[in-house]
Amino acid sequence: MQLNVNDAQAIEVSELTFGGEFNETLVHQAVVAYMAGGRQGSKQQKTRSDVRGGGKRPWRQKGTGRARAGTIRSPIWRGGGTTFAARPQDHSQKLNKKMYRAALRSILAELVRTDRLVVVQDFAVESPKTKDLLGKLNNMSLTDVLIVSEAVDQNLYLAARNLPHVDVRDVQGSDPVSLIAYDKVLITVSAVKKFEELLG
């Protein structure tokens, strides 16, 4: 299949990588797994056994007329432990490499199908100035965009750093969440070839 390139001839690309069907279930699974892997999972609360004190019972079992109490750190009491206390846990989900690659192929194919993939021969800025990058993007009518190149250009990265709706990634650093989070994905021809090499 062919991909149109801005201000250049169309390029021939793999049907497998850029022309497959959209597998929504698989993409959802990949996105959930990716986001779950980013969770810190370090929250911790104290149960009645973790809270300091509460070893001696506050009053005797019988004869006071009050309700029975065995510890001042009971979850019912103020200053007591938490009933179902949170514990540190690993939230990461297993996703096979084969499934992950298939999800990326599915996302790329959907980007092509919905005209959200903008292919350019090359994309760079001469100096690390946000104003210069913004001018280039405005000329292409791009406001909410992910820029993907084979390797991240330092000037481009610095110029985009202060723009809330622009992100710069290399092919290796592209993930399912970033690829679907933006209105458009601006990608260089060399990055397209790299994707074919990795996902083909």
UniProtKB/Swiss-Prot annotation:
Residues 38-68 are annotated as: Disordered. The keyword Kinase does not apply. InterPro entries: Ribosomal_uL4 (IPR002136), Ribosomal_uL4-like (IPR013005), Ribosomal_uL4_dom_sf (IPR023574). Keywords: Ribonucleoprotein, Ribosomal protein, RNA-binding, rRNA-binding. One of the primary rRNA binding proteins, this protein initially binds near the 5'-end of the 23S rRNA. It is important during the early stages of 50S assembly. It makes multiple contacts with different domains of the 23S rRNA in the assembled 50S subunit and ribosome. NCBIfam families: rplD_bact (TIGR03953). Part of the 50S ribosomal subunit. This is Large ribosomal subunit protein uL4. It comes from Pseudomonas fluorescens (strain SBW25). The lineage of its organism: Bacteria, Pseudomonadati, Pseudomonadota, Gammaproteobacteria, Pseudomonadales.
